[in-house]
Structure formats: structure tokens, C-alpha cells
Amino acid sequence: MPHQQMLILFGLLPVATNISTWWNFGSMLLACSSMQVLTGFFLAVHYTANINLAFSSIVHITRDVPYGWMMQNLHAIGASMFFICIYIHIARGLYYGSYLNKKTWLSGTTLLIMLMATAFFGYVLPWGQMSFWAATVITNLLTAIPYLGTTMTTWLWGGFAINDPTLTRFFALHFILPFGIISLSSLHIMLLHEDGSSNPLGTNSDIDKIPFHPYHTYKDLLMLSLMVLMLLMTVSFLPDIFNDPENFSKANPLVTPQHIKPEWYFLFAYGILRSILNKLGGALALAMSIMILLTIPFTHTSNIRSMMFRPIMQLMFWTLVATFMVITWAATKPVEPPFTMISQIASTINFLFLIMNPIAGWIENNIMKYN
């Protein structure tokens, strides 16, 4: 019976023949999610959510717990792998017009917001210098909200500064949010298979479909194998490549690091935040850098779905990718010229893409009409 169910699930799932490797990142994200939950559970068993013991408990996990170093590194580097996959997944959705499947896109964007919140809470848990100060800076942005800001910040912290109650609730949130992510991922997949996935040409996939198994399962397995290989290579040879040197010191509220910054996968949002000198303006720009993805399905005006046949939008898309990388790089630098100016220019171009999206569609439609 289970074998028959598997056949129904995979064998009879009709999928477009021409979907490329860029469509594999969904299954890779599922694998990353499973690994994060498993490694996270084993870490939670040994972790102590107390400001005096949290840092020591991480040291204990890496030194004394059998294979604890592997669990800790898999969890930390797995998070980076998760974000690499999700950013590629979103880029593919933008490039090939997958956002026109509105319900799937909106549930996916909600998933991204939940994932970013989970990763942020997780970054605070080791209670190192950068964990503490990144948490202080980011949560302090809530004070920019008029009238309610200070009350909300005090409520989130559980006091008048980041302390033991903050760490306890961040651990609780970091533990519970992945279950919400799993539930929403299931909904995301269900909504996707309501209409079926798109394809690189942006045409109706119903014309030419093949069973998911064995054709696409083997293609997925190849990419999964490559991802696991990269992950294990990084864990084995470069385990601290994504770590900040400041985070190897225990949190000290009396000593501020020279340059406070979050993990690399938040640097683009942090760079946009820093490029605006006003606190409320920066906080709004930070929120909009993610929330603006929600508007994309409603600003598509072109008669063509995929960017494969849209040269103007291709140019804009790759400009967006370049600005994303430039903002990420600039955010690692101190807040001084020329990095401030670079961040401001790149942030402006970043938001211009989303304003130009409907305009480029109208231009392309008119060019095709007159030809």
C-alpha cells in the first residue's frame, strides 16, 4: 500500500518536460528544512537558555558531546545553505514569472519572512558578542514605531534591556517557528500543485507533461547530492567560514564591537537599513526590502510571462542581482565614505527595479504591438 501511495504521489504527478535545474531548489529547501529541524533538536537537548550558561553550553556541545561539533556546524552552515537555496528559488520565480501563481507566491513570501525571523532568533542564542549586539541593534528598531515603539520593545525584551528573559523567549520562538514553517511549506506545495508549476518558456505546461518519477526525481537527487557534498566539505574543512570572529567571545554589554553586523544572509537588508540616516525611514526601508516582493504579482503588465523573451526585463533583473551583491558587500564595511554612498545608490537601484517592472511591461507590449 505505501508503494502505491508513493506511485500516486510521484509517479502520477504530471510535470512539464522542460523544467530546468532552477526548479530543483524547492526540493533542496525541503531537505535543508528537514536537516535543520533534526540538528536543531539535538542541539536543543544540550543547550541552556540562560545568559550565564548559554555560551558555555555551546562550548560544551562542540567539545564534550559526541559529534556535537558536527551538529553545531551542520546547523549553522545549513542555515547559510538554506538561504542560498531560497534566494536562488526566489530569483528563479522572478525570472520565469512564477509569481503570477499569486497564492503560491504570497505563501512563499510569508515563508521567507518567517524563515528570516527564525534565523535571527537563532543567531542570538550562542550569546556571543555579535549575537548580543546584533539583537540589541535590530530589536531597538521597534522603538522607531510612533507611540507604541517603546512599549513593544520593552515587551519583546521582557525588561528595559536585553537580558535573561529575552534569551529565553528567543529560544522558545526559535524552537516553535520551524513548525510553523513546515506547516506553511505544506500549504505552499499544495497551492503550487493546484495549478501546477510553470516552465522556462512561460507557456501553458498542460500541453506537454511527463510523470515526476523517475524523470524529475533523479534530477532532484543529483542536485541534492551536490548540495550535501558542498555542505559536508564546508563543515569538514571550513567550519567557521560564515562565523564572525567577535562571536567567539562571550557577550559583554559594556564593550561594543567596532562594527556590528548580522549574518551574511541579512546583510542586504541591513545595508538598506544603514543607507538611510533616519531611524524610522531605515526601519521602513528594511521592512519594504522584503515586503515589496508581495507587490510583484500585481505590478506585472507584460503579455509575456517569462523573462526569457524580455530583454529589457533581463537587463533589469541582472542589475537587481548585482545591486543585491553590492549592498551585501557594502554592509560588511564601516559606516563611512565611500561605502555609505555606494549603499545608497545600490539601494535606490534595488527599489527602482520594482517600480520599473510595470513600466517595462508596457514598453514591451507597445514595441510588440507596433511590430
From Swiss-Prot:
Heme as a keyword? yes
Query: Where along this sequence does the record place binding of a ubiquinone?
Result: 193
Q: Which organism is it from?
A: Eryx miliaris (Desert sand boa)
Q: Which PROSITE patterns match?
A: CYTB_CTER, CYTB_NTER
Q: Kindly list the biological process annotations in GO that this record carries.
A: mitochondrial electron transport, ubiquinol to cytochrome c
Protein's UniProt name: Cytochrome b
- Which family, according to UniProt? Belongs to the cytochrome b family.
Describe its function.
Answer: Component of the ubiquinol-cytochrome c reductase complex (complex III or cytochrome b-c1 complex) that is part of the mitochondrial respiratory chain. The b-c1 complex mediates electron transfer from ubiquinol to cytochrome c. Contributes to the generation of a proton gradient across the mitochondrial membrane that is then used for ATP synthesis.
Positions that bind heme b b562 = 75, 174
Q: How the cofactor binds, per note?
A: Binds 2 heme b groups non-covalently.
Spell out the molecular function terms from Gene Ontology.
Answer: metal ion binding; ubiquinol-cytochrome-c reductase activity
